[in-house]
Each structure stands twice: as C-alpha cells, then as structure tokens.
Curated annotation (Swiss-Prot):
Gene encoding the protein: Il36g
Organism: Mus musculus
The entry's keywords: Cytokine, Cytoplasm, Immunity, Inflammatory response, Innate immunity, Secreted
Propeptide residue span(s): 1-12
Name used for this protein in its record: Interleukin-36 gamma
InterPro entries, A to Z: IL-1_fam, IL1/FGF
An example Gene Ontology CC term for this record: extracellular space
Family the entry assigns: Belongs to the IL-1 family.
Post-translational modification: N-terminal truncation leads to a dramatic enhancement of its activity (>1000-fold). Proteolytically cleaved by cathepsin CTSG.
SMART domains: IL1
Subunit annotation: Interacts with cargo receptor TMED10; the interaction mediates the translocation from the cytoplasm into the ERGIC (endoplasmic reticulum-Golgi intermediate compartment) and thereby secretion.
GO molecular-function term, one example from the UniProt record: cytokine activity
Pfam families per UniProt: IL1
Length: 164
C-alpha cells in the first residue's frame, strides 16, 4: 500500500520542486564527491546534498500501483539521477540536467524517473526504465548504485527528510 503523495506540486500557481536530505538505515547521508553521490556517516561535520524532487507530470502513461513516479535531482551542482545500460548492466548516473526541464518535457523522461514508495518511515526508489532495480547504498565512501538484489546485501530503504 502506498501513502499519499508527500510532495507539493503547486506553489504560487507554478510547479516547484521539494527539497530535502536522504540517509540510509545505517545513518549514511548522500554527499557529492568526484562527480558521484557517495554515502558517508551522518555527523555535524558533514553537509549532505540537498535533493530536489518533482512528481512526473504524466503518471497515467506509466505503470500504476508501483509508487509515485518522481524526478530526483541534487542542488549545487544542478544534476539529476538517471539510469542507463552500461556494459550490459543497468547503471545509476548523474547528469547535468535541470529538474524543471525534465518536468516540463512533453512526455515522461523514463531514464530519469523513479517509483517512490513509502513503507512506514522509509522510502524506496525503483527505476522506471529498469523495473526491479532500486537505488541502493553499501559501504561508507562508496557511490550509490542500482541493484536488483532487493533486501539481500544492500540498503534500498532510505529516510527522505523533506524540508518545508
């Protein structure tokens, strides 16, 4: 069962992304390092990236009952997460892209979309382009990545802290 949409889409008559922070169940936050998002232990000396989130404008054209289709980006630098096949494997990458440009595109930009599902207090992010592949984290200092090994070795459950 999915919770109601936690994101606002209309503020002052226009679409505006929500902002927040993400950390995994091991209390590792996402930071931007060497052109990648890596996880490090949460502490007062660490400044996590600010994630930007916007729902897909055309959810009816995507699979239903999978969660809320969202675009997921970061601020400073403005980049968005996307999925593409690299050497035969679905891969999570960052691309210089403005989240509002993706939102206003005349059709869903599937490589940039993730099904966001909330269960209790945690969230999962499943690739729309590669169903069954989830954003995951592992050891400290390693980049976040895509995995199809749901619940085996990697953290696929995250806390998403939306700032108002």
């Amino acid at each position: 069962m999915f919770s109601k949409h936690p994101f606002s889409t209309h503020i002052s008559g226009r679409e505006t992304p929500d902002f927040g922070e993400v950390f995994d169940l091991d209390q590792q936050v996402w930071i931007f390092r060497n052109q990648a998002l890596v996880t490090v232990p949460r502490s007062h000396r660490v400044t996590p990236v600010s994630v930007t989130i916007l729902p897909c404008k055309y959810p009816e054209s995507l699979e239903q009952d999978k969660g809320i289709a969202i675009y997921l980006g970061i601020q400073n630098p403005d980049k968005c997460l996307f999925c593409k096949e690299v050497n035969g494997h679905p891969t999570l990458l960052l691309k210089e892209e403005k989240i509002l440009d993706l939102y206003h595109h005349p059709e869903p930009m599937k490589p940039f979309l993730f099904y966001h599902t909330r269960t209790g207090g945690t969230s999962t992010f499943e690739s729309v382009a590669f169903p069954g592949h989830y954003i995951a984290s592992s050891k400290t200092g390693n980049p976040i990545f895509l995995t199809s090994k749901k619940g085996e070795y990697y953290n696929i459950n995250f806390n998403l802290d939306i700032k108002s």
